């Protein structure tokens, strides 16, 4: 059903108050704090670990499906657009951002996870960043702030907060990191000049972080940068160039969600000048810069390449190490695989890289989830490992890899020492009319990992969803979602009942037993 969309009252909005009072009657006692969502946002949590709270059900049937893009940006093979992750509450409400079309914008829908019945919907006036028009269309930024509220990007760099996510009815409120009164006074100017450019990330205290763009002459002196909305509703921001300590830095990397340390005190994200990037660390309360590292190609030592068609975001490991995927320079020298750069928590020590980084966010697997693993690392990483079919370069043997961040081997595709391959699995389907051994790509930018069963849920461009058993290294299950389609990479998600959510050809599928 349609919901009321109204701005918040003047002055700071207390997010904590909204969480406690939304829907409370008269003198009723405030309810206890909401439970933790099953899947809060991109890659599951603020560290982007990709870990599930429930083991996936067997892949035997499609329970329900919904279209996530009604006017996809098409090419011959399939849609080339990044889509926002579905979010799932502990009560099994699935929040799905939907692209209606280039001119009609976006909306957000809430579904009952058990049967796919739509419970609510609301539109957003969000517009995509002006600078993204030459890249694959970006997703609409959204995150569950807690188990009862969703934050969605709105027009002019604002955030729309929908309360009572698990209920049919709920109010939608608007908040602006630069002040709602300023937005009201200069609505048209803000809407024309300011857009949110990254997925939203929720901190452990309920703060929301995101990158934004601001055109020249934007109201309030805004410049491209990073914003925070605190649990009490107060906004703050910092220019991208101040985060990097370099005036030439122009913006936050498009589509790259901020990642947070496990204690929530340090955030990480990429800033760019043209296609040259820096990974920066910042204080999550004050937004003051803490750390910075210029990103380089491990093979050529040239500047690594950051482009807007990538959705790569940092991952924070259990030990605080930070991982971030980049393209090489030149990109063809490593078969357009890119590199997974690996840093300590202070970004001062560059560790062994991974042999793939293009448009991916690695997921984290406790080493105890892989009984046959004989190494010494406490955790492992799941990485896309495609070797794209490019004449004179890649052979089209596209894989996923389980990598050991604490061990090294010689790269199969260069002379660089890279993270050790614990397991790899080749995609199973030959591409028609291509050389023998050239298989469909693994179509993933973030995969759901189940620590309990030691398995990974991964999409493939052959139209199937697969379960990869990390202990045996075998693809043990699959289900057909649709016809083969070349498309921008998508994520997998697992809900609290074990339903797996996967996208193929602009459709979200709910899969289980």
Where are these regions (language model features)?
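C-terminal region of N-terminal signal peptides and the immediate post-cleavage residues
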Residues: 18-36, 48
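Exposed boundary/loop context
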Residues: 4, 16-20, 43, 491
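Intrinsically disordered, low-complexity serine/threonine-rich segments
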Residues: 5, 17, 31, 416-417
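Bacterial N-terminal signal peptides that target proteins for export
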Residues: 1-12
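Low-complexity, intrinsically disordered regions enriched in charged/polar residues
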Residues: 11-14, 56
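Extracytoplasmic/lumenal domain signature
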Residues: 33-42, 49-80, 88-96, 101-138, ...
């Amino acid at each position: 059903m349609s919901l009321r969309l109204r701005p918040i009252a003047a002055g700071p909005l207390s997010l904590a108050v909204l969480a406690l009072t939304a829907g409370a009657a008269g003198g009723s006692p405030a309810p206890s704090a909401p439970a933790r969502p099953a899947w809060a946002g991109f890659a599951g949590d603020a560290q982007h670990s990709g870990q599930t709270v429930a083991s996936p059900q067997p892949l035997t049937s499609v329970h329900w499906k919904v279209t996530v893009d009604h006017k996809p940006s098409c090419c011959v093979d399939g849609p080339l657009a990044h889509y926002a992750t579905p979010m799932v509450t502990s009560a099994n409400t699935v929040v799905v951002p939907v692209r209606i079309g280039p001119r009609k914008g976006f909306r957000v829908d809430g579904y009952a996870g058990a049967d796919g019945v739509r419970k609510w919907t609301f539109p957003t006036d969000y517009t995509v960043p002006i600078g993204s028009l030459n890249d694959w269309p970006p997703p609409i930024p959204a995150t569950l702030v807690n188990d009862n509220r969703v934050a969605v990007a709105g027009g002019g760099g604002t955030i729309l907060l929908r309360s009572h996510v698990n209920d049919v009815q709920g109010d939608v409120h608007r908040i602006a990191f630069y002040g709602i009164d300023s937005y009201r006074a200069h609505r048209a100017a803000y809407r024309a000049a300011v857009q949110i450019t990254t997925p939203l990330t929720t901190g452990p205290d309920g703060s929301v972080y995101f990158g934004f763009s601001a055109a020249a002459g934007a109201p309030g002196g805004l410049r491209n940068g990073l914003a925070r909305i605190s649990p009490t509703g107060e906004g703050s921001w910092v220019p991208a160039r101040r985060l990097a300590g370099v005036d030439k830095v122009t913006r936050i990397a498009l589509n790259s969600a901020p990642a947070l340390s496990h204690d929530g005190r340090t955030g990480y994200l990429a800033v760019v000048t043209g296609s040259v990037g820096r990974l920066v660390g910042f204080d999550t309360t004050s937004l003051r810069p803490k750390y910075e590292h210029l990103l380089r190609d491990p093979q050529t030592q040239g500047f690594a390449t950051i482009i807007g068609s990538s959705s790569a975001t940092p991952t924070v490991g259990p030990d605080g190490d930070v991982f971030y995927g980049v393209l090489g320079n030149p990109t063809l020298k490593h078969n357009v695989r890119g590199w997974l750069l690996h840093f300590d928590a202070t970004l001062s020590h560059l560790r062994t890289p991974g042999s793939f980084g293009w448009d991916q966010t690695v997921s984290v697997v406790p080493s105890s989830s892989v009984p046959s693993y004989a190494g010494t690392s406490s955790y492992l990483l799941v990485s896309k490992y495609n070797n794209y079919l490019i004449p004179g370069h890649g052979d089209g043997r596209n894989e996923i890899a389980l990598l050991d961040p604490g061990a090294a081997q010689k790269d199969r595709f260069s002379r660089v020492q890279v993270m050790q391959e614990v397991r790899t699995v080749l995609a199973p389907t030959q591409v028609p009319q291509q050389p023998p051994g050239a298989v469909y790509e693994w179509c993933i930018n973030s995969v759901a990992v189940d620590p309990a069963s030691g398995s990974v849920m991964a999409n493939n461009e052959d139209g199937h969803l697969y379960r990869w058993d990390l202990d045996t290294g075998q693809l043990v299950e699959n289900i057909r979602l649709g016809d083969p389609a070349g498309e921008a990479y998508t994520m997998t998600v697992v809900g609290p009942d074990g339903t797996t959510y996967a996208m193929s050809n602009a459709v979200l599928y709910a899969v289980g037993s």
